[in-house]
Amino acid sequence: MTVLSTNALAGKVVLVSGGTQGVGAAAARTAARCGAEAVVVTGRRPEVAEGLVDELDALGTEPLFVRADVAVVEQAVASVTETISAFGRVDCVVNAAALTDRGTLLDTTPEMFDAHVATNLRGPFFIMQAAVRDMLRREAGGTIVNVISISAYTGSAILAPYAASKGGLASLTRNAAHAHRGDRIRVNGLNIGWTATEGEDVTQRRFHGAQDGWLEEAGRDLPAGRLGDPGEIADMIVYLLSDGSGVVTGSVIDWDQTVMGGQG
């Protein structure tokens, strides 16, 4: 289900990096439901993408899976060039791929730091670069949404490299929006909070020893009584991609159950 119009993205070619699971997959489904002409999803594992591609096809869009690790610049750029090769253009981009391994200021290795920057910042940078070049070439404008994180503000102590990389992506979002505000290219971002995704389940079990039922237990301590839902985030992503969001650009919207600066 989506609260958006079924033609919100009519005729648009949408590229979703990290689009085979979690928030990325939800955004791909919502884009298809909202009339996108084509939805391209990227990921590292074709077997994970198979079912999603079938879903997208059933929703009436033309789906395409591009195998790509956004941490590798050549593969990140290739996801854009393959989209253009298949459909002639890229109108909308969602950068949803992310790495969330744990590391503090004291125990993060150079390799871990570089891995976070490569996936969470460098990959989106060069995807945006390639997409914006196509948009400028066609003088057609376009929209980009970067899936950032509430950790871009501070983050917990065990998320030092993650917070640093996401803080960089928030700044990049505003910088790109400012640079191309005169080209009808809008760039926005979402600082998403704790969300119930497949990846979060793996993270909780791998790093925190979580057991079955952890999701419900964690939700009881939150204002809404639950974690965020990927489908809700997808609605906001597609809204920001669509003409319905008007002239909005350079906005990084907090999508969380906490209020920055709130006390007591």
Residue ranges and their predicted role:
Residues 94, 181, 186, 248-250:
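Short, small/polar-rich loop/turn modules that mediate ligand/substrate recognition or access, typified
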Residues 104-105, 112-117, 218:
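Substrate-binding pocket helix/loop in short-chain dehydrogenase/reductase
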Residues 20-21:
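Conserved glycine-rich cofactor-binding loop
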Residues 133, 178-182, 246:
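Alpha-helical segment proximal to the catalytic Tyr-Lys
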Residues 149:
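Residue(s) in the substrate-gating loop at a strand-loop-helix junction
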Residues 2-5, 154, 238, 249-264:
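Short C-terminal tail/terminal secondary-structure segment
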Residues 128, 165, 173:
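Active-site helix of classical SDR
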